[in-house]
Swiss-Prot record:
Binding site for a divalent metal cation 3: 2, 6, 11, 16
Record's protein name: Metallothionein
Residues where a divalent metal cation 5 binds: 21, 23-24, 37
Entry similarity comment: Belongs to the metallothionein superfamily. Type 1 family.
Residues reported to bind a divalent metal cation 4: 20-21, 31, 35
PANTHER family: METALLOTHIONEIN, METALLOTHIONEIN-1X
List of residues binding a divalent metal cation 1: 8, 11
Keyword Glycoprotein: no
Species this chain originates from: Phasianus colchicus colchicus
Membrane-spanning residues: none
Task performed by this protein: Metallothioneins have a high content of cysteine residues that bind various heavy metals.
Residues noted as binding a divalent metal cation 2 in the record, renumbered to the chain: 2, 13
Length: 49
């Protein structure tokens, strides 16, 4: 469970596309490109790699 590990911000993440940020809280699906991971890249947030 990645709850709380990601949050939506201005879409700056070039590696995030479409709904790759499935670990983000509800409401972030439409802002997947702006998914910013607070956890290390080694976390379960695949969209943050």
């Amino acid at each position: 469970s990645c709850a709380g590990s990601c949050k939506c911000k201005n879409c700056r993440c070039r590696s995030c596309r479409k709904s790759c940020c499935s670990c983000c809280p509800a409401g972030c699906n439409n802002c997947a490109k702006g998914c910013v991971c607070k956890e290390p890249a080694s976390s379960k947030c695949s969209c943050c790699h």
